[in-house]
Amino acid sequence: MKKILILAFSLFTLGTYAQREVPQSRMEQIYEEAKTPYKYGLAVAPADNKHKIDCPTVFREGDKWYMTYVVYNGKSGLDGRGYETWIAESDNLLEWRTLGRVLSYRDGFWDCNQRGGFPALPDMEWGGSYALQTYKGKHWMTYLGGEGTGYESVNKPLYIGLAWTDRPLGSAHEWQAQDKPVMSIHDKDAQWWEKLTQYKSVVYWDKEKTLGAPFVMFYNAAGRHPETDLKAERVGIALSKDMKKWKRYPGNPVFAHEADGTITGDAHIQKMGDVYVMFYFSAFEPSRKYKAFNTFAASYDLVHWTDWKGADLIIPSKDYDELFAHKSYVVKHNGVVYHFYCAVNDAEQRGIAIATSKPMGRSQVHFPEREVKNRRMVMELDKGWKTWLCDKSAYGQADNAPTVVDIPHNWDDYYGYRQLTHGNLHGTAMYEKIFTLDNSLFPISNSSFGKRYFLRFEGVGTYR
């Protein structure tokens, strides 16, 4: 009898282990299903260079689509107060109208300066309703919060807060929130991988209780590995039966890339058949030439994840996302996949962009004009030059009367009976342009102003 029991247990163990890896063929199917090669452009962009927009969450209520996103009110990582959470609506997932705030700064609380929210309990089904489910008659939202000013945790650690509302989602109104965080790096059961700070969190309603509780929170946090001392951002899980009291999963972190400074974060999970798909972003990955990108992993049990080794889903490739193209929220509707992501350009302008599985046109939303930050300024000087011939030529007489031209310019028309390779007209011509440099474009603190100017001429006297 003992031998039979041991054999049965061994078979069960092997079967469980085999389930942990999602086969490559299935991963390729997921990639083909989710890829979005057509970049539509920006969906939401700041109106000025004193704000940055980040972290989209998209859901449906009735016949409208809604997007929450966070807004940072600073030009750099140090000069702003912090995050607030806003909401926008759309009829078609492409064109968005801003409605207003849902989580604002609140003085005198633990989260006075940071309130970046992420709506909870979304429908996890790929191509499903994308509605937010209610629990106890309320909609819920977890958020990264803190008292430190600046961009995210630049000055002080962030913790995880909880907010809710019983009002319609389609109106911009302030959500209620608890007076203290539900998760903190100072909790007695806080784990090594989250000891520095906590970041984005999303709560899913797993009614099958795969991990023993109905509410599963995926969150990313920063910490140092106790053995290697590698500092990185990793993804872990917390569980709850009532949305308010949370217990950390003992096997955390459940997903990470162990390279110093690497970020693995912002898990967005949907279920494709029997497989859970985690859309996530990675940054400063040594194997990539670009700095930040979106890709995916897959799992049968929410804990053991198989990383996709093929082409990334979203990478920097446009002038609006050339620095970072990261932080996924993916929706499939009416046969089209919409991949919302945070786009950051080299001027550090930050907004929400969309890529799609089918061509959907081009967005009319753009970042504001970039500010001149550097000591180097580029001016176009190709218009309005005066020019005149200075001497006799082989096939023409000098004419001292100037004429106004744009450069590149050539006096020769290449006509004439000889049709020489270098033209028929030979001699000397003068070109003159007077321009004024606007000193106001240079900051007063720029001590190099007035010392050096470089003019590069192209196309005067050239031929093709």
Model-derived features with residue positions:
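Beta-rich carbohydrate-recognition and catalytic domains
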Residues: Q19-G117, L121-Y199, Y204-T262, Q270-L323, ...
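Short, surface-exposed beta-strand/strand-loop-strand elements in extracellular ectodomains
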Residues: T462-R464
